[in-house]
């Protein structure tokens, strides 16, 4: 297969990705990825090492089912900007049992209450919460939010799980005998805390969601007998491109961020508050040259903003796509240029 010539005129990482759209038409997706370093005083600079586009994604751990630390960066498009926070809750003083963690990027904001370890415990007097342990650095993962699955009621044919976060904790697992216990979530919505045993609350998180989780999975369309008969292997006619947005509920912007928005993170570093602005960078422009046809100019959209407070990195992704009827063989040149 002939590979297109790549001309990257930006200081950022760039990757052309060849996939298919909903109707199995070959498309080229141009993904531009910028990495910036920031310090705790809010100074931002372009990183010496630009992180490459991550086609496979990266889980938080190597257990068979883990939440994504970084999603695979191969979406066809996103209809709005995803905002993702990667890091740990950091209590401002020793001995604290709760800290409120937050992020704000332009119009997008979210706050969570983060607690030290605690459990539901079965005793002769009933099921009660244990004492809350002093907070240490708590990873802001979906594993530490409300959710999980109930192994006692699951079968090989059917898993009983919290559909919005099957990797979390606090869901299911009946407590029936003395000493039985169930870990409560560390991360909760401060407006909807877990009040009593058996309560079901919205999982609260800051990370990437997985395609099979709700509400994201509801946008994947209807896979029924009619689809099987008349449309398979294409995606269902009611597939909704909102499926491609992978940020947590509350962290999808109303449209695309433009750059220069203010960013504030709370209680996720040794400094309780860190603030800076997104770089005032215009979206890069891509030009795709198709064999025997006119060039296609592709303006990109800033569709993913990742703030990693562990590494003190800001990652921005811009994306665009174009039909390429012959797949990679149809594309002779891909250029990307920075715009002022």
Predicted regions and their residues:
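Extended intrinsically disordered or low-complexity segments
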Residues: 3-340
């Amino acid at each position: 297969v002939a590979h297109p010539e790549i001309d990257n005129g930006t200081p950022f990482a760039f990757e052309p990705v060849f996939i298919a759209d909903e109707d199995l038409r070959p498309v080229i997706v141009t993904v531009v990825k910028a990495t910036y370093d920031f310090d705790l005083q809010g100074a931002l600079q372009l990183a010496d090492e630009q992180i490459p586009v991550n086609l496979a994604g990266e889980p938080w751990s190597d257990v068979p089912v883990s939440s994504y630390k970084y999603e695979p960066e191969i979406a066809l498009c996103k209809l709005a900007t995803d905002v993702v926070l990667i890091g740990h809750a950091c209590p401002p003083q020793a001995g604290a049992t709760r800290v409120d963690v937050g992020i704000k990027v332009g119009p997008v904001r979210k706050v969570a209450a983060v607690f030290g370890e605690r459990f539901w415990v079965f005793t002769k007097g009933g099921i009660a919460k244990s004492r809350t342990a002093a907070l240490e650095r708590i990873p802001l993962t979906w594993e530490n939010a409300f959710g999980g699955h109930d192994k006692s009621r699951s079968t090989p044919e059917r898993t009983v799980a919290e559909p919005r976060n099957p990797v979390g904790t606090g869901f299911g697992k009946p407590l029936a005998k003395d000493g039985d216990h169930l870990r409560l979530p560390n991360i909760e919505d401060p407006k909807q805390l877990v009040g009593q045993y058996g309560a079901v609350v919205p999982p609260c998180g800051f990370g990437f969601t997985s395609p099979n989780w709700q509400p994201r999975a509801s946008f994947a369309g209807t896979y029924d007998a009619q689809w099987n008969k008349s449309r398979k292997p294409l995606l269902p006619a009611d597939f909704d491109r909102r499926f491609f947005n992978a940020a947590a509920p509350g962290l999808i912007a109303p449209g695309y961020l433009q750059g220069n928005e203010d960013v504030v993170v709370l209680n996720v570093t040794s400094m309780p508050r860190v603030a800076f602005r997104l770089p005032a960078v215009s979206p890069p422009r891509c030009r795709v040259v198709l064999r025997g046809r006119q060039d296609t100019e592709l303006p990109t959209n800033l569709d993913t903003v990742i703030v990693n407070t562990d590494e003190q990195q800001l990652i921005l992704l811009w994306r665009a796509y174009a039909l390429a009827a012959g797949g990679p063989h149809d594309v002779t040149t891909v250029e990307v240029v920075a715009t002022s």
